[in-house]
Structure formats: structure tokens, C-alpha cells
Amino acid sequence: MNILIFSNAMKEQDFALYQSEAKIKPNPSNQNFYYKLIKTLAINNNVSVVSHRPLVKGMFRKNYLEGDTVFDGKIKFYYTTNRCDKVFKLLKEKSVIVKTAKQAIDDFMSEDFIIITDTLRLNLLKAAKKVAKLYDTKIIGMLTDNPFNLSSGSAFVKKYLVEQASNLDGYLSLTNGLVEVFNSSAPSYVFEGLVCEESEGKKDPIFNYFYFGGSLYERYGVKTLVDAFHKSNVKNKLVIAGSGPLAEYIEQMAEDDYRILYLSQLSKEKNIAYMRNSIANINPRPLDPKMDNESVPSKLLEYLSIGTPVISTKFPKLFSTFKDDITWIEGNSIEDMKYALEHYEVPNQEEYLKKAATARRKVFEFYGLNVQAESIDHFIAEINSSTKN
């Protein structure tokens, strides 16, 4: 089957270069998820990606990105041109994406294909819908979050985005709650995420530390983690990596508390190395019925796939599966976090490692690329066949 994906995702090596050169660091979570989705779809299908790379003013020395076409194994990435100016965004961006998609379709040498699109980037979504209409083909939306949960963008744009994404032919979704937000009557396949084998990045640690790597937002529990650690009697260090609004606060806390180390945004390889060598990786995202219903803490699945012990809040969708394999934080408060950190018994690390190995086996059984590829392919085939009825 030919699959055309509309996304911001890039070839992994290209994203690493893009991230290293960017003055304003992009959040890698979108890249990480979509790249795994692309690899999953490419296991049994012919996949091309229309990649509209993120670009904001001041991100690079030049305020534009040139188009290009690159191979990643048998996957073909079609990079669109992109500019920072408002005229381009308002009048030209969608048509540039459509033009790039037409090139990808010509290279399929067949108009028998199906579209999968990001649903959180407005012009990308509108371009995907236009291409679907031009070629009379089915379009599936990938639901990763509710636009109203995002920190940027006006309420009007978020409402419009949901409206634009609410009339697609089907949905791949990370939660049932997202299907309810966009279109509960359309066909959908729900899976909490994807995990894959990562490069070793293994080095002997020079000190014992707990680790968090991700977006530095208070709503994700990062401030609670830092404050709890600062108040704790833990002798080991806390290493924080990532970028976001709390970066300045964490830098200040690191100056005040020698046990806290802030590393800013790391490359994927360094992030993996820190995860592999930690005493335990921490998912501090607080329990919140709305957020839990509409988004998945992707870091938790990533941590589980590494095989290092995990300390986490009780995300409902994963708690029952990994009940005995994770050190659970009982609540959302600083005291709950402090208790979990202080009662993590480092002398019993071998027992924690055994639990981590069990968790790793389970997470690949449920969310490994090959496992999910079969289910996702079956769903896409059902959507695609409905065009011929």
C-alpha cells in the first residue's frame, strides 16, 4: 500500500543536525513519535513523507528553509520550503505543501494511496485535506493531543483546528478521549504509543543520579519534582534535561542546590545515555482526569523501553499493566514526590532492575513497532477499502 504522511517529522539524522544548529530548540517529542510511526508504517508499506519542518523567526541564521528530497532506507522524505514571514504563512504555505505532495504522488507512479496527517498543524492539515480531495483518496488523522491543551495559539485557532480535523475518514489516536474531542462517530484505532530499540549510548556513570528529560512545564510536574528533591534528604543527584518556561527556575535551583544538575536540551544520543545510566528515570506528570483522557505521557513509555527503573505518577491507562514493575508516586503533591524519592532504596537496585527488565519486555509486547504495525495496517486497509464500496 502507498501511504503519504503529512508531518513535521524528518529523517532522524536530519533532525539531529537541525536541532544542533537551531538557536531556538524544538521540542523533540513530536519528531520522536512521528518518526516511530513512520518506521512502523514502512514495515509493510511504501511510505513517503511530506515534511513541513518547524520554523520561527530567530531559529536559524537564515529565515527560510530550502526544499529537498532524501531517502531513509526505503522511506522518502520530501522537505518543503518554509519561510518565517507572515505573508508566506498566510498566502503561500498551504500551496507549497500541496505542490510538494504532488511531487511525492508523481513518484508513487500511482494515484492509489492513502493519506495520514498530523492534526495539530493547521496549514499542514488543510493541505492534506486539499490533496485528498484533488485525488479522491481517503485521509486519516493522527490524534496526539487536544489543541486546547497546547501552550501556544489562540482559542479561535484551536477551535478552528478541531473543526478542520473533525471530518476526516478515520483516526489513529493515542487515547479514546481524543476521539471524543474530534469525531466519536468516525472509525478509529487507539494505541497509547510506540517503542523501538534505541542505540546503546552506554557509558559508565560518574555519579548516582535520578533523571528527567523532557519539556520543562509546571503542568507536567517538573516544578513539583525539583521542589520535592530540593526539600528531600536524598544524597544522590537529580539531573534535569530539556527546554521550556521552567529552564530559568531550574538553573537557579541548580545554583542553590549542588545536588541538582541542569543540562538544557540534549541530543537524542545523550538523552538515551543519561536514561540508561540513571538510578531511576522519573515521570512527574500529575494525575489530571482531563489531561489523562486526552494525552499520554510519552516519556513514560520511553523510560520503560530503556530497561532502567522508573518512578512515576499513576497514569491510569498504564497502571494496571505495569502495577508491579514501577515505583509509583501516590499523588500530585510535593510531599508525595518527596516521599517517593526518599524511599527509593538504592541498596536494593538489583531488585529494581529486575522489575525494569520485566517492564521492558511488557512494553515491547504491547507497543513495539512490529506488534503495532499489524494492527495499524489492518485498520488502514479497512479505511482504504471503503473507498471501493
Regions found by a protein language model. Give the residues of each.
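Donor nucleotide-sugar binding/catalytic pocket of nucleotide-sugar-dependent glycosyltransferases
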Residues: 33, 144, 148, 161-201
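An aromatic- and histidine-rich active-site surface loop
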Residues: 56-58, 90-100, 115-134, 329
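Nucleotide-sugar-dependent
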Residues: 220, 269-274, 283-302, 311-321
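Membrane-proximal helix-turn-helix segments that form the acceptor-binding/catalytic region
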Residues: 34-39, 123-126, 130-135, 143-171
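Conserved donor-binding/catalytic core segment of Leloir-type glycosyltransferases
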Residues: 4-6, 201-220, 225-230, 238-239, ...
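Nucleotide-activated donor-binding/catalytic signature segment of Leloir-type glycosyltransferases, i.e.
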Residues: 248-275, 280
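Conserved acidic donor-binding segment of nucleotide-sugar-dependent glycosyltransferases
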Residues: 326-335, 342-349
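N-terminal subdomain of nucleotide-sugar transferases
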Residues: 1-63, 170, 227-233
